[in-house]
Amino acid sequence: MNPPILAIVMSTVISGTIMVLISSHWLTIWIGFEMNMLAIIPILMKKFNPRAMEASTKYFLTQATASMLLMLGIIINLLLTGQWTVLNMPNPVASNMMTAALAMKLGLSPFHFWVPEVTQGVPMSSGMILLTWQKIAPLSILYQIAPSMNPNLLMAMAIMSVLVGGWGGLNQTQLRKILAYSSIAHMGWMIAVTTYNPTLMLLNLTIYITMTLGTFMLFMLNSSTTTLSLSHTWNKLPLIASLILMTMLSLGGLPPLSGFIPKWMIIHELTKNDMAIMATFMAMTALLNLYFYMRLTYATALTMFPSTNIMKMKWQFESTKNTTLLPPLIMISTMLLPLTPMVLTLF
């Protein structure tokens, strides 16, 4: 894609998300979602091939259906209240419709089927945007309408998302699909705490985006797309192999890494609100995610691909890829746990 066209498309994606974030009027929020959706399609089709075209079509159809459902909920709310404001949501039918539409945009279960397929069909950089930036706008609306949402509906979607995200990733060998199922599971954790403490959902989103960005950048730096390709990493780039190991364990929520903070806080919040059984169930299902992350760390750091090369390290050219953002992302992804009290004061 030409740099000027890419700049225009990216600025439209960012503008659409910002419009959703700063608006309190349902019509401008809907327009922001549409701008974002239409501008992301060329980014998904950056490498023009049948797989990218199929993935983009699936994404467009899913998001268009979600937008239609969202507009239907907005119109029902408008007819009943006569207002366009976001915070005025007294009708449960409109609220449930909007929740379902936003769940479809986020890829929450049972509307999750498009997430692995679309992520696998697009380039790694497009998948990174899809699983990070594209989550911000729908979650910001969920944050605003949290008091008027049905907590039972949200909890059911959270349970299904955590289960699907854990089970779905167990038999995968493609890294993009693994990260897609990981995204579904993380969204489930965020939704579980939305009605009790929406601010904690923002903390979880911030840490999730940081960890996922770092992971995608490491995979792109290493040109890895499958579990098998990770086994070449230790021969070529031992430092990158160590960093992949750390970020994978952090995504799995293993202490003392940063990924443990949101899980710890969410379990504490659920227990505080007499949801101890739910907290126990979610903690147990998190082990499914941890298992496939452990598989990836084993493939990266504890295996070496058979080679006839007698040298310990393979000779290679110095990487020309830009890694400016990588060090701060890795530090935040792995070393935030001691700063938990300070982080909590920010949210």
Swiss-Prot record:
The lineage's top-level taxon is Eukaryota
The membrane spanning regions, by residue number, are 5-22, 26-45, 60-80, 150-170, 178-198, 200-220, 237-257, 274-294, 327-347
Annotated Gene Ontology cellular component terms = mitochondrial inner membrane
Topology of the protein relative to the lipid bilayer:
Multi-pass membrane protein
User: Could you say which EC number(s) this protein's record lists?
Assistant: 7.1.1.2
Regarding protein family, the annotation reads: Belongs to the complex I subunit 2 family.
Name of this chain's protein: NADH-ubiquinone oxidoreductase chain 2
Gene name tied to this protein:
MT-ND2
